[in-house]
Amino acid sequence: MATIQDKARALISSKMKVDESEITEDKHFFNDLGADSLDFVELSMTLEREFNVKFSEEDMSNVKTVGDIYALIEKYTK
């Protein structure tokens, strides 16, 4: 069974057009994965749909790395 991180990694890979093997918890969405603000908003909406959660603007403003998004998803799915 796929973990939250596995599912999120696959979605991030697809959205950012980056190989899954390059997506590690320390990767910064903007600096390392080349996301722009529109990519980031679209990714957050995709993750909300996939995990059936709703992130606040404050939550998302604190997300900088892949690890941050993993932690946020886990916070809302527990």
What are these regions (language model features)?
Residues 2-35, 39, 43-45, 50-78:
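Phosphopantetheine-dependent thiolation modules in NRPS/PKS and related acyl-activating systems
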